[in-house]
């Protein structure tokens, strides 16, 4: 049976800018129904991920839907868009990690329940799917991005790193913070614990990633050699977690997460997986056990609507920033206001393809 988390109170959500200023609500989207035979199913993760997996039957996708954990991701958030998978979609992916302790709320202790004590979001991504459903864009927001965290249910109400919102107020406050930062309305939420990477990777028999230069993680003591590395579940978890010992720290970790998600998608959709029912079922079962989604999220509906997507149709982007600075005694990532407004404005206007064509360096596919 699906797990449901408790609701929170209900203050109003307003649209913001990349620096958190309030504004008018985003324009409602026009729905264009497009129904047909199921050919794809979305599994997922994150640190977060959308996987488009071909060859699953309608009944099996329905069974996967029933296995997903559910939460009231929009508790306390008013003026939500209508729930339809036709038209554009903006899906927030959160990769949570409980190993290192929580950030502390300026208004009190770390919130338990929706987020959970000692749980935080180490990967924050927005999946944007245009209205024609021919492409998809996964936009990473560095977890240390310095933003205005709005108040919700007595938590937040301060400037902080964006991932503090999850520790302070769980998924609802994270949704509100991301919407405030981007000016983009979130349609659905998918959260995965980083430990879910292990089971999904092992179910596929491991994945291959390319590393540019040999590097050792000082925490896990694992060495990733220059060239192609075959990662099992434990190695994959270390790969997406590492930031110490990397030339650009957390920025390289963001790119590693993007590289790993692409490798996982490619492995999950190759012929060796699709032609092996046992492997495919093992992977999808591992994914659904690790996922928490909003109450209206439907794998079945998304499998119908996004049936033409393949891993090669997905581009990875990082929200523009000016690098790290020291503010109030802590190292934070400073958003590039002008460039970020342009990117997130393109998401809102459904013109990301044009933005990416004008900014090709932001298509993140390099090895780390």
Q: Residue spans of the language-model regions?
A:
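Non-catalytic, solvent-exposed segments at the cell envelope interface
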Residues: 2-368
């Amino acid at each position: 049976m699906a797990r449901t988390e408790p609701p929170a109170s209900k203050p109003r959500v307003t649209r913001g800018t990349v620096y958190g200023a309030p504004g008018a609500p985003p324009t409602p989207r026009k729905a264009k129904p497009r129904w047909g035979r199921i050919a794809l199913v979305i599994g997922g993760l994150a640190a977060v991920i959308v996987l488009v997996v071909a060859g699953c039957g309608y009944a099996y996708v329905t069974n996967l839907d029933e296995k997903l954990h559910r939460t009231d991701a929009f508790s306390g958030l008013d003026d939500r868009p209508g729930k339809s998978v036709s038209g554009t979609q903006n899906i927030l992916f959160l990769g949570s990690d409980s190993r290192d302790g929580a950030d502390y709320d300026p208004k009190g202790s770390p919130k338990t329940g929706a987020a959970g004590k000692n749980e935080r979001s180490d990967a924050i991504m927005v999946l944007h799917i245009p209205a024609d459903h021919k492409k998809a864009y996964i936009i990473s927001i560095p977890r240390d991005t310095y933003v205005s965290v709005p108040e919700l249910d007595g938590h937040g109400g301060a400037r902080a790193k964006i991932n503090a919102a999850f520790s302070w107020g769980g998924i609802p406050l994270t949704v509100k913070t991301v919407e405030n930062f981007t000016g983009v309305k979130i349609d659905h939420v998918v959260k995965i614990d980083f430990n879910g990477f292990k089971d999904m990777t092992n179910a596929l028999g491991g994945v291959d990633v390319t590393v540019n230069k040999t590097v050792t993680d000082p925490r896990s003591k694992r060495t990733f050699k220059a060239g192609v590395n075959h990662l099992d579940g434990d190695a994959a978890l270390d790969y997406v977690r590492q930031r110490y010992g990397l030339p650009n720290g957390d920025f390289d970790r963001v790119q590693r997460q993007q590289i790993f998600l692409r490798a996982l998608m490619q492995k999950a959709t190759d012929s060796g997986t699709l032609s092996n029912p046992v492997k495919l079922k093992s992977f999808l079962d591992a994914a659904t056990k690790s996922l928490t989604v909003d109450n209206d999220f439907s794998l079945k509906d998304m499998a119908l609507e996004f049936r033409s997507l393949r891993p090669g149709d997905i581009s990875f982007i990082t929200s523009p920033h000016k690098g790290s600075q020291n503010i109030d005694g802590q190292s934070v990532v400073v958003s590039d206001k002008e460039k970020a407004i342009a990117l997130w404005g393109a998401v809102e206007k459904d013109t990301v393809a044009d933005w990416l064509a004008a900014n090709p360096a932001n298509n993140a596919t390099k090895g780390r």
